[in-house]
């Protein structure tokens, strides 16, 4: 009996093709949903103060931290579950068991983070003196519980590379969240003012988050019951037997990987989200709100494009590179492994070219027009933020975005090819970097009083260190297959594009100046950016043609057959 007639794990071509088709749906839905979020948020930002945004952003960060620690190591590991049985229900149940493990992880994590927040968080002190703080806490806790309850189903769909369902479910949930937040804020504005409005506004965001989680829960649960009602897959922890009749709940090899990833995720969370922890202790509520708005507007491309690409790349590479562990009886393992290695390397070249050129365009357009665009988007509402340095700091955040992008894709590749030994070594490296980043951040933010500028510099150091480590490990991985990844070649390859970008920027500097200050200059910057895009496309046409053809031919082959 099969879990799903359309899913046949074990065929790397089908896996890759499924991943490519699925991620296209995921990217499209996420772009539409997040653009909708962006547009609807424009309707309410005029009513919100930096302190409201600071508190709500921090509460969302706490919820995401609990969810991250509870489930991320499992999400990274379930693709490694061995598909070593003809009974697809048996394999699916192994995956579901790991999803249940995420719920068990959550209880101690809830206790630790809850105690820490109640005793050491200045943001929570601010929340407790505001009206309606009790419903806020209840709604956020309930939303975390609901999202954890769907984790077994999420893991099953992820194992099957079924991005279609995820894109539909998340798109629906984001839409509901947007509508609830906008309507709640607009309604609260009619009946409350001053401090009471701030309390109700925070409660409105909590209600929106709860509606998001409830929608996800309903969609995943109904889908699971409809699709698997005739299969022998249980939504609970089931004791299984291996080929030697030994009973187990969790596949031992995969459980070892979960442990390795869990330790790694602790440090990754501190490094990735440590800026929010630092500013909660070193910055005022208003500064936190300013940084949240800047990050929200500045990273919209990262959230729309980079994040889906990173996740799909990690999943696809993991399935391809670990398929040999499920087919040890094949007569041509060496040929298959070498072929998979070259397939992933071609994809790596293609996506690196894309990321590099997109980063140049982001820097060229964002540094020049970013502050003006931010003012334009906020319109007459900008007066609420005049006392902050958000418009001066925004170009600095734009410079940070390429580091964020390359770190994300390289870590996705590294996690897909890492062994248990690699994960242990990476955990040690992350320990060292965590300590260095915390010290560096404290010195820049507090001692040198650079505030958010210091925070951005610390984040650049953080991402640069991780990029360097992942580059070294990825190069070492491919060198075993006699594929050379040379840093000198990368620099030589990058120089012409950087030179062209610099020349166009200098020309623009004489015509527009360092930053745009009016709509005419914004249009001129857009024209210069368009010219840069055309030139870069012409320059990269030959470089990207060969790897692009290899990747597309491989992925489209099942369709042609």
Swiss-Prot record:
Chief place of localization: endoplasmic reticulum
Gene Ontology cellular-component annotations: endoplasmic reticulum membrane
InterPro entries on file: RFT1
Topology term for the membrane: Multi-pass membrane protein
Location within or outside the cell: Endoplasmic reticulum membrane
Organism in which the protein naturally occurs: Candida albicans (strain SC5314 / ATCC MYA-2876)
UniProt function note: Intramembrane glycolipid transporter that operates in the biosynthetic pathway of dolichol-linked oligosaccharides, the glycan precursors employed in protein asparagine (N)-glycosylation. The sequential addition of sugars to dolichol pyrophosphate produces dolichol-linked oligosaccharides containing fourteen sugars, including two GlcNAcs, nine mannoses and three glucoses. Once assembled, the oligosaccharide is transferred from the lipid to nascent proteins by oligosaccharyltransferases.
Keywords assigned: Endoplasmic reticulum, Membrane, Sugar transport, Transmembrane, Transmembrane helix, Transport
Family the entry assigns: Belongs to the RFT1 family.
GO molecular function, one term: flippase activity
Domain of life of the organism encoding this protein: Eukaryota
Protein name (database record): Man(5)GlcNAc(2)-PP-dolichol translocation protein RFT1
Spans traversing the lipid bilayer: 25-45, 49-69, 95-115, 136-156, 168-188, 199-219, 350-370, 398-418, 429-449, 452-469, 493-513, 519-539
Keyword Membrane among UniProt keywords: yes
Involved pathway(s): Protein modification; protein glycosylation
Gene responsible for this protein: RFT1
GO biological process: dolichol-linked oligosaccharide biosynthetic process; glycolipid translocation; protein N-linked glycosylation
């Amino acid at each position: 009996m099969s879990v799903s007639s359309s899913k046949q794990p074990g065929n790397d071509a089908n896996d890759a093709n499924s991943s490519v088709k699925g991620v296209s749906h995921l990217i499209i839905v996420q772009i539409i949903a997040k653009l909708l979020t962006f547009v609807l948020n424009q309707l309410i930002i005029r009513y919100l103060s930096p302190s409201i945004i600071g508190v709500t952003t921090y509460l969302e960060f706490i919820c995401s931290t609990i969810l991250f620690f509870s489930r991320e190591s499992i999400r990274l590991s379930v693709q490694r579950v061995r598909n070593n049985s003809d009974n697809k229900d048996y394999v699916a149940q192994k995956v579901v068991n790991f999803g249940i493990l995420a719920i068990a992880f959550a209880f101690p994590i809830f206790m630790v983070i809850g105690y820490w927040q109640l005793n050491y968080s200045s943001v929570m002190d601010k929340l407790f003196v505001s009206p309606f703080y009790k419903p806020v806490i209840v709604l956020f806790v309930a939303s975390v519980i609901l999202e954890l309850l769907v984790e077994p189903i999420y893991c099953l769909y992820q194992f099957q590379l079924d991005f279609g369902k995820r894109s539909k479910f998340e798109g629906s949930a984001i839409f509901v969240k947007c509508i609830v937040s906008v309507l709640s804020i607009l309604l609260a504005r009619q009946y409350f003012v001053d401090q009471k409005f701030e309390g109700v506004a925070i409660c409105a965001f909590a209600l929106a988050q709860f509606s998001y989680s409830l929608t996800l829960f309903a969609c995943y649960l109904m889908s699971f019951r409809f699709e698997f009602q005739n299969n022998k897959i249980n939504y609970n922890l089931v004791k299984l037997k291996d080929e030697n009749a030994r009973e187990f709940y969790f596949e031992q090899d995969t459980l070892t990987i979960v442990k390795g990833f869990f330790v790694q995720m602790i440090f990754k969370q501190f490094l990735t989200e440590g800026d929010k922890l630092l500013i909660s202790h070193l910055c005022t509520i208003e500064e936190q709100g300013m940084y949240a708005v800047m990050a929200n507007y500045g990273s919209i491309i990262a959230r729309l494009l980079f994040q889906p690409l990173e996740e799909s790349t990690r999943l696809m590479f993991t399935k391809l590179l670990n398929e040999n562990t499920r087919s040890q009886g094949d007569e041509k393992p060496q040929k298959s492994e070498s072929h998979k290695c070259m397939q992933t390397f071609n994809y790596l070249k293609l996506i690196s070219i894309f990321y590099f050129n997109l980063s140049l365009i982001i820097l060229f357009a964002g540094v020049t027009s970013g502050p003006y665009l931010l003012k334009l988007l906020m319109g007459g509402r900008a007066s609420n933020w005049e006392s902050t340095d958000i418009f001066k700091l925004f170009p600095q955040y734009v410079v940070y975005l390429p580091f964020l992008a390359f770190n994300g894709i390289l870590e996705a590749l590294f996690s897909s090819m890492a062994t248990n030994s690699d994960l242990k070594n990476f955990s040690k490296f992350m320990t060292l970097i965590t300590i260095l980043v915390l010290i560096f951040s404290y010195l820049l933010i507090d001692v040198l009083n650079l505030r958010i500028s210091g925070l951005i510099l610390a984040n650049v150091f953080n991402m640069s260190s991780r990029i360097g480590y992942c580059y070294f490990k990825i190069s070492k991985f491919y060198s075993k297959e006699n594929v050379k990844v040379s840093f000198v070649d990368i620099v030589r390859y990058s120089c012409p594009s950087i030179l062209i970008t610099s020349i166009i920027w200098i020309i623009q500097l004489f015509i527009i100046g360092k930053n745009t200050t009016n709509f005419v200059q914004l249009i001129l910057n857009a024209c210069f950016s368009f010219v840069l895009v055309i030139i870069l496309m012409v320059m990269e046409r030959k470089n990207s043609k060969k790897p692009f053809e290899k990747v597309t031919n491989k992925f489209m082959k099942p369709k042609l057959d």
